[in-house]
Amino acid sequence: MITNPIQVSIFNAVADALPFGLDKSKVDVVEATAYSPSPIAIHDYAVGIMAAYGGVVEHLGTQRGLPDQTMSLNRRHCGLALNSGQMHFLNGYGTLMDTWPIGPDNGTYRTADDRYATMIGLHPHLRDKLLGFLDCANSAAAIGRSVQKRSSSELEEGAAAAGLALGIVRSPDEWLDHPQGAATAQRPMVELRSRGSGGTRRLREAFRRPLDGVRVVELTHLIAGPTIGKLLSEQGADVIKVQPPMGDWVLPLWLDVSWGKRNIALDIKSKSGMARLAALLADADVLVSSQRPEALARLGLDLDGLSRVNPDLIFTQVSCYIPDSPWAARRGFEQIAQSVTGVMHAHSEDLPAPTVVSVLLNDYLTGYLGAIGTIAALSAREQAGGFWTVVASLTKCAATSLSTLRPADSEPYAPASTQDLIDFAIDQASPSGVFTRLAPTVAFSHTPSYVRRATNWPGTSPDTVDWEADDAESDVPHVPSVLARNGAIRNLVPCYGIEDRGDGGGGLSLASPLLMKLVQESRQF
């Protein structure tokens, strides 16, 4: 049973948002050493949410005829999973060996009113637009000079009007006093709503795993949304990820969260592309989207449009800000969510300047919350039928994490190491080679979590691909990491996480400083 008070409180907060109860007596937690130093109890926060994920998976499984199950989690494993991209290797070499994330357009800078603002350029089109807004060159010095000419509110509002991702570093109290923070505080950790009952689609009795036969269309990008699809696939769902033929893939992150999916390229702005998407949706159980609502509405895929295509659909939406709120249409990323909600402020109180936490706290855990809501909605649909909506947001996840604050030095920390891969990693073969990655965080007593398809590249499957037969199955295709045990992981850098810094001079990266140093030293030219 979960006994840690923080883990219990988060588990209960998630359970309170669901239409049925969760039994924490079925969950066992191994209390292991943390690796991400912070006054926010990151590992315990992760355990509470991940245990709730295990609970809803078990609930739906028993509803579909599978036996009752117990679940086990390891506290350290749960925290490491919030940086799973750093623990991802192909033939022994890290897939995050890429210097793209370190541009000065991703960083935190001091403003004219002596505050800080965090900005994310990340993709080329956003970077160019951001530099145009700032009217400066793409260097930390130039961006810093431009930012120091404007007040924090001028920057935040101007960036929002321009469709850019930028947020003031607020304290937790400032966030709660802000209209957006107040609106967020009133909402549950994950939201489920029914838009009509009845319907005809129900799931058959499960063959082997809780989500056998569940069909999922994914219209997502980066981490939070794709994590939902990955988690559903680990429990047996058939996931088809739809991407535009051209775009910003951020390949290291793509590989981390594309396990278990068939990836197709589809131009849904074209008549033929939309027809193909509609055909997939008509026979789907779930649509997972991280697209902004107005973008979907322009394509005729607002709630009314989706319900016409499929009146039994579960529409899961993940975003930075909750829908129907003052900032619902604004862009946001992990670091922006940390900045505006007070997470960066709370994490940095004993540091010389605002610094984000060393894991992608909100990206991955919002993915878990979205998966929890999706599975809960599938369960509710079995009883009432109909069209359901599920909402999870980065800022709700971030703000809730502040309930776990305690002194940062209240426990010891140990850096990530090869021993972690020996303890928690698996090897899985693919056409590209052998991937080593962290195993699923929740171990079930009867139904193992696994994916039959290794991660693959954008557009690997043809756009004519169709849903699989319900009984498609195979043996567990992964094994505890042989490469790690044999010392064949070549470039794991011991570190305490991503170690992003926003120190008033820019410099946010998805890699630790030690990893980036290794990248530079290993260049051949």
Predicted regions, residues:
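Short, well-ordered alpha-helix to beta-strand connector turns
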Residues: 236, 260-261, 284, 333
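Intrinsically disordered, low-complexity repeat tracts
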Residues: 493-504, 513-517, 521-524
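Rossmann-fold NAD(P)-binding glycine/threonine-rich loop
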Residues: 301, 305-310, 319-335, 342
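Redox-cofactor binding/interface segments in oxidoreductases and associated redox assembly factors
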Residues: 218, 289, 317, 338, ...
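Acyl-CoA thioester-binding alpha/beta core of soluble enzymes
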Residues: 1-246, 282-283, 307-322, 346-347, ...
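Glycine-rich phosphate-binding loop and adjoining beta1-alpha1-beta2 segment
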Residues: 241-268
